[in-house]
Amino acid sequence: LTEEQKQDIREAFDLFDTDGSGTIDAKELKVAMRALGFEPKKEEIKKMIADIDKDGSGTIDFEEFLQMMTAKMGERDSREEIMKAFRLFDDDETGKISFKNLKRVAKELGENMTDEELQEMIDEADRDGDGEVNEEEFFRIMKKTSLF
């Protein structure tokens, strides 16, 4: 994290530690995360507190908050990188990677792949059976293969 990002996280933490206790509870955490551009669900908040709140106090101190947000921001960065890669494939901007898109990229990269191999790649990632790979399917397969 940059110093600026750390400062942003500190400011969000202080802003939502409304009673100045040095800790934030579940309700305060939800508001703090929204301020940083996340839309956490109630279950996510509960899980985050449970994962971080080692002493069982039901609240999070700044160090715990910083660790959690650092991980979250890393996730967001890798998602942005994956979406950039997606857009390189989706040159016709349909929001999906077609067989034709994949074939073009393979050719540009000098990969000698058969049509069957390319189709297998599409089939592996294609969850909804429409014969193409949408953003979510692409994200999922990239995460699954640990390329990001």
Swiss-Prot record:
Q: Where are the transmembrane segments?
A: none
Under the heading PANTHER family, the entry gives: EF-HAND SUPERFAMILY PROTEIN, MYOSIN LIGHT CHAIN 1, 3
Question: At which positions is Ca(2+) 3 bound?
Answer: D126, D128, D130, E132, E137
The organism is: Tetraselmis striata (Green microalga)
Query: Quick one: a GO biological-process term for this protein?
Result: cell division
Give the UniProt tissue specificity note.
Ubiquitous.
Looking up Gene3D superfamilies in the UniProt record yields: EF-hand
GO molecular function terms attached to this record: calcium ion binding
Residues annotated as domain EF-hand: 4-39, 40-75, 77-112, 113-148
Protein name (database record): Caltractin
The UniProt entry, under InterPro entries, shows:
CALM/Myosin/TropC-like (IPR050230), EF-hand-dom_pair (IPR011992), EF_Hand_1_Ca_BS (IPR018247), EF_hand_dom (IPR002048), RNA-helicase_DEAD-box_CS (IPR000629)
Identify its protein family: Belongs to the centrin family.
Source lineage: Eukaryota, Viridiplantae, Chlorophyta, core chlorophytes, Chlorodendrophyceae
Q: Where does Ca(2+) 2 bind?
A: D53, D55, S57, T59, E64
Residues reported to bind Ca(2+) 1: D17, D19, S21, T23, E28
Question: Which SMART domains does the UniProt entry name for this protein?
Answer: EFh
One Pfam family this sequence matches: EF-hand_7
